[in-house]
């Protein structure tokens, strides 16, 4: 691989990681200001459960790109906060399905509004066509590596 390509690759990785971190920090700050006792990591699990609850911890691992110990810890903490509950699967008692509590359902609207607000701030001066190109390129990179 030519040296200049490697440096380009470092740049892309740096920029995407830096942007992702900046968005996460801003969203966390908004959660804190709004009095939501929730980390970005916990929110990402809730986000996937809002899309489809009653999924296994393994499915949460796949959806969030986290390993089993990380998801177990996050679900443990969400359970302590009374935001999720584990229910043994009727088909396979070794599997726990994760369901939202009423308290978690109440957080959905406010937290999603804050997330949308944060993304709007992040993309405020970016033209729509550049956003589309960026999404395409990142999808290709992901597809190449999965």
Predicted regions and their residues:
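N-terminal leader segment of winged-helix/HTH proteins
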Residues: 1-34
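C-terminal regulatory/oligomerization modules of transcriptional regulators
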Residues: 1-7, 128-146
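N-terminal positioning helix adjacent to the helix-turn-helix/winged-helix DNA-binding module
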Residues: 12, 41-42, 103, 130
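Alpha-helical linker/hinge and terminal dimerization helices associated
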Residues: 19, 23, 30, 64, ...
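N-terminal helix-turn-helix DNA-binding core of bacterial DNA-binding proteins
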Residues: 21, 25-66
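Canonical helix-turn-helix DNA-binding module
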Residues: 40, 53-97
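A cross-family signal for key residues in well-ordered alpha-helices
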Residues: 47-48, 62, 109, 135, ...
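Charged, amphipathic alpha-helical coiled-coil/dimerization segments
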Residues: 76-136
């Amino acid at each position: 691989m030519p040296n200049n390509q490697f440096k380009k690759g470092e740049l892309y990785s740096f920029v995407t990681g830096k942007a992702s971190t900046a968005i996460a920090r801003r969203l966390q700050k908004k959660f804190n200001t709004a009095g939501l006792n929730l980390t970005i990591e916990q929110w990402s699990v809730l986000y996937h459960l809002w899309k489809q609850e009653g999924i296994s911890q393994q499915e949460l691992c796949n959806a969030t790109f986290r390993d089993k110990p990380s998801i177990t810890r996050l679900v443990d903490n969400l359970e302590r906060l009374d935001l999720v509950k584990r229910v043994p699967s009727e088909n396979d008692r070794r599997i726990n399905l994760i369901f939202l509590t009423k308290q978690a359902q109440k957080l959905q609207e406010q937290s999603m509004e804050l997330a949308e607000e944060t993304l709007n701030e992040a993309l405020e001066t970016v033209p729509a066509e550049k956003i589309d190109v960026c999404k395409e390129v990142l999808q290709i990179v992901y597809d190449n590596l999965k």
